[in-house]
Amino acid sequence: MEYMRAKKDVFRFDGYAGADTKYRLKVSVFTEEAWHSLFAKTLFINAEPNELPNWSNDWTIIDASRLELEDPAKYGVRQKLCIVQSLERKLVLIVGTRYAGEIKKSIFYAMNYDLPEVGVFPMHCSANVAKDDPSNVAVFFGLSGTGKTTLSADPKRRLIGDDEHGWSDRGVFNFEGGCYAKCINLSQEGEPQIWNAIRFGSVIENVVVDPVTRVPNYDSAARTENTRVTYPLDFVPDAVDRKSTRLNSSHEWI
C-alpha cells in the first residue's frame, strides 16, 4: 500500500463481473499503469457514471505491476513476482508482473469460490447463441489457448462471451464485458471477427509492433507465444450487449 501511495498517478476502475444482476460482483481495480486500467475497463462490465459517486465494491484489486520485492521471504512468498488473494478480505494483490491477464483471472477465481454456494456453475468456456432462438445456447470448454474464442466467433450466431460464464436455473450469463483473445498467427482470413475487433480502444499485449510503421506482427513469437488482444463486446457485430441483463434460457449444447 505504501508503494502505491507514493505513486504520482494511480488509475482506478470501478465496474462489475457478471451480467446477471442477481449474481454479479462489484469490483474496484487500482493500477500503476494506465493500460492495465484500460484492460479492466475493456474486460469487465462498466459501472454507469451515476453509480460512481456512492460506489461500494465487493472486491478490490491492487495491481503493483512494477514492484519487485527485495526480500520475498519477509512477506511469506518465494519470489519477487506473486499474486496474493484473500477470500476472507476480498482483496487481490498483484506484484511484479505486467501480465494483465492476472487481473481478470483473480476475479474468475473469486466467482468460482462464491457462486456454487448460490446455485451457479462457474465455467471456463466461451458461449454463443442462435440469432433466431435465445434458447439455443452453445458452450465450448477448454483451457487457455485451446480455441474457445475462435470456436465461439461464429458469424451465424451471436457471441455471449469468450472465456468465463455462469450457468444457473435462470440461464447462461457472461462474467465479463469483453474478450481476451490469443493473436499469435492471427489473420483476417482465418479469424475475421477477432481481426476486425482490433482497433482504437482495444489493447494488444506481448505483440511485436514495428517501431516505424506501428503495424503489429502477429506472426512473431519473439517475446512469447502468449500474445493477446483485449476488446469490448461492443466491437463484435451482433454480440449480446455486455451491459444487458437479458439472460438466455437453459437449453445448452456442449
Stretch-by-stretch model annotation:
Residues 3, 109-114, 131, 154-158:
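Generic, well-ordered alpha-helical scaffold segments in large soluble proteins
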Residues 23-30, 106, 141, 153-154, ...:
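Short acidic, glycine/serine/threonine-rich loops at helix termini
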Residues 160-225:
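Conserved nucleotide-sensing/catalytic segment adjacent to the nucleotide-binding pocket
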Residues 130-162:
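Glycine-rich phosphate-binding P-loop
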Residues 101-127:
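N-terminal pre-Walker A segment at the start of P-loop NTPase domains
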Residues 243, 247-254:
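Single conserved hydrophobic/aromatic residue that forms the stacking wall/gate
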Residues 1-97:
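Long, basic/Gly/Ser/Thr-rich N-terminal segments
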Residues 224-244:
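Long hydrophobic segments that form regular secondary structure
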